[in-house]
C-alpha cells in the first residue's frame, strides 16, 4: 500500500471515524469562503489541500497544509496583531485543521494525538473560528483518545502536595490593616450594588458570589494538569510586562507548571490575560458569569473572560482598563492596590502610546525623587482570598501581586 493511503492509527479506528464525521461528506460541501485579501496562490493551495484530503492522499494533504501554514504564519507575524486581517487567521485555522486530521492518518506514534492537539491549539490561539468552531470539536474528540498520562509531578519538596509548593523569593504580604481597605459586602442586591458602587465607580469586594462555582471545590494544581496539561498556552516570562527583558512564549500547561511552579526557575512565568475558557470548555463549565454583569449595557457573549494563573510573586504593574472588571480569586491570595482615575497625574502614566494605560511607578518600591506626587495619592488595598470577587470600576488604576500559587478569573464587561 502506498504512503498516501496509510490506514488509520492502529487500534484507533474509532478516532478516525469520529474525526471524519465532523467534516462534510463531499468536498464541494466544505465551504472555505475566503475573502479577496487572501493571495490567490494561497487560496489555490488551500483548495488543493482540501482536494487531497477528500481523495485520501494524506501525505500530500499534510505537505500542502504545512505550506499553507507557512504562508499564513508570515502574514500573522507581519506588523501589529490588531492589523492582521481576519481572513488570514481563517486560512491559518484551515491549515491547522487539515494538518491535525492528516496526522491522525499517519503511521502510529505515541505522540500523534498530543501533536494533533498542539496543532489545534495553535489554530485556536492564532486563527479565527471556521466551520462552526470545528477545531474545538476536533480537540474534544482527540482528548477522549489520549493515552493515560503520567501522574502530575511533585515539586522539590516531595513531602508536600504540589498545590502547596510555592516559591519563597516574593516579599511578604503588606499589613493592609495599616492601609485603607476596600469595603466588603456579602451578596448585595443588584440595585444596591448598582446605586452604591457601579454608578459612582467605587471598588468593593463581594463575598459569596462564587461560593457555588464547581471550581471552588474542584480546582487544584493536579486537577488543572489533568484537564489542561497537554494544551498549548501563551506564557509571559519576566517580572512585569514593562521590563525590557519581558517576553512571551508558547508551551503546554504541564511544561508551564513544571518549569515555573514546581521548579525554582530563574525567571517568573505567568499565564496572564488569556481566554483559556474559550480554548478549554471543560474549565469554563466550572465557573459562572456573575449576576451583576447583567447591569451592563452589553450582551453576555460580549463579556471577556480571562485566566490569570501563576506562582507566588507574579506582578501586574499599576495600570487601568477601559471596561468594568470583576476579578474572582479561585486559588491562593493576591495583594491589590487601587487608585482612583482622579489620581492619574500622581501615578505618572507612561508617555508612550502603547503603555499610556500603565504607571511608571514601582508601587511597592517607589522612586519618590522621580515621582514625588505618588506618595500623596490616596489608595485602597486588599488581600483577595479564594471566593472573593473584587469589583474594579472602569479606568480605576490597579496593581496586583500574587502572594501564593494563584488562579484568578476576570470578567471584563461594559
UniProtKB/Swiss-Prot annotation:
Region of interest (Disordered), residue spans: 148-169
Domain JmjC: 269-414
Region (Interaction with RCCD1): 1-107
The record's free-text note on cofactor binding: Binds 1 Fe(2+) ion per subunit.
Keyword entries, A-Z: Aminopeptidase, Biological rhythms, Cell cycle, Chromatin regulator, Chromosome, Dioxygenase, Hydrolase, Iron, Metal-binding, Nucleus, Oxidoreductase, Protease, Transcription, Transcription regulation
Tissue: Expressed in a circadian manner in the liver.
Cofactor: Fe(2+)
EC numbers for this chain: 1.14.11.73, 3.4.-.-
PROSITE patterns registered for this protein in UniProt: JMJC
Knockout consequences: Conditional knockout in liver leads to disruption of circadian gene expression in the liver.
Superkingdom assignment: Eukaryota
GO molecular function, one term: methylated histone binding
GO terms, biological process: circadian regulation of gene expression; fibroblast proliferation; G2/M transition of mitotic cell cycle; in utero embryonic development; negative regulation of DNA-templated transcription; positive regulation of DNA-templated transcription; protein destabilization; proteolysis
SMART domains membership: JmjC
Name used for this protein in its record: Bifunctional peptidase and arginyl-hydroxylase JMJD5
Species of the source: Mus musculus
Lineage: Eukaryota, Metazoa, Chordata, Craniata, Vertebrata
Amino acid at each position: 500500500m502506498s504512503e498516501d493511503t496509510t490506514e488509520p492509527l492502529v487500534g484507533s479506528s474509532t478516532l478516525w471515524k469520529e474525526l471524519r464525521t465532523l467534516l462534510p461528506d463531499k468536498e464541494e460541501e466544505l465551504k472555505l469562503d475566503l475573502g479577496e485579501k487572501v493571495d490567490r496562490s494561497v487560496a489555490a493551495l488551500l483548495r488543493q489541500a482540501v482536494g487531497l484530503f477528500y481523495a485520501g492522499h494524506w501525505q500530500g494533504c499534510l505537505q500542502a497544509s504545512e505550506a499553507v501554514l507557512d504562508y499564513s504564519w508570515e502574514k500573522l507575524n507581519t506588523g501589529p496583531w490588531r492589523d492582521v486581517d481576519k481572513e488570514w487567521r481563517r486560512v491559518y485555522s484551515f491549515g491547522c485543521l487539515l494538518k491535525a486530521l492528516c496526522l491522525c492518518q499517519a503511521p502510529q506514534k505515541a505522540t500523534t494525538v498530543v501533536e494533533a492537539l498542539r496543532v489545534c491549539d495553535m489554530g485556536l490561539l492564532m486563527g479565527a473560528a471556521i466551520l462552526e468552531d470545528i477545531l474545538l470539536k476536533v480537540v474534544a474528540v482527540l482528548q477522549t483518545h489520549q493515552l493515560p498520562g503520567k501522574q502530575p509531578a511533585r515539586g522539590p519538596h516531595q513531602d508536600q502536595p504540589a498545590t502547596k509548593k510555592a516559591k519563597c523569593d516574593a516579599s511578604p504580604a503588606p499589613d493592609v490593616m495599616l492601609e485603607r481597605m476596600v469595603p466588603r459586602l456579602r451578596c448585595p442586591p443588584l440595585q444596591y450594588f448598582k446605586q452604591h458602587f457601579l454608578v459612582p465607580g467605587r471598588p468593593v469586594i463581594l463575598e459569596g458570589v462564587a461560593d457555588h462555582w464547581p471550581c471552588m471545590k474542584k480546582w487544584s494544581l493536579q486537577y488543572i494538569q489533568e484537564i489542561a496539561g497537554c494544551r498549548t498556552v501563551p506564557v509571559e516570562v519576566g517580572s512585569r510586562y514593562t521590563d525590557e527583558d519581558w517576553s512571551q512564549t508558547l508551551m503546554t500547561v504541564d511544561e508551564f507548571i513544571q518549569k515555573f511552579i514546581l521548579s525554582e526557575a530563574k525567571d517568573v512565568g505567568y499565564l496572564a490575560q488569556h481566554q483559556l475558557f474559550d480554548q478549554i470548555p471543560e474549565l469554563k463549565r466550572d465557573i459562572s458569569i456573575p449576576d451583576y454583569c447583567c447591569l451592563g449595557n452589553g450582551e453576555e457573549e460580549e463579556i471577556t473572560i480571562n485566566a490569570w494563573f501563576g506562582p507566588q510573586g507574579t506582578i501586574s504593574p499599576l495600570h487601568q482598563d477601559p471596561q468594568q472588571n470583576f476579578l474572582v480569586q479561585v486559588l491562593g491570595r493576591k495583594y491589590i492596590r487601587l487608585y482612583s482615575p482622579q489620581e492619574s497625574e500622581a501615578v505618572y502614566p507612561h508617555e508612550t502610546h502603547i503603555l499610556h494605560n500603565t504607571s511608571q511607578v514601582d508601587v511597592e518600591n517607589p522612586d519618590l525623587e522621580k515621582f514625588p506626587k505618588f506618595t500623596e495619592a490616596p489608595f485602597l488595598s486588599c488581600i483577595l482570598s479564594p471566593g472573593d470577587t473584587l469589583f474594579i470600576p472602569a479606568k480605576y488604576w490597579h496593581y496586583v501581586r500574587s502572594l501564593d500559587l494563584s488562579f484568578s478569573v476576570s470578567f471584563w464587561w461594559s
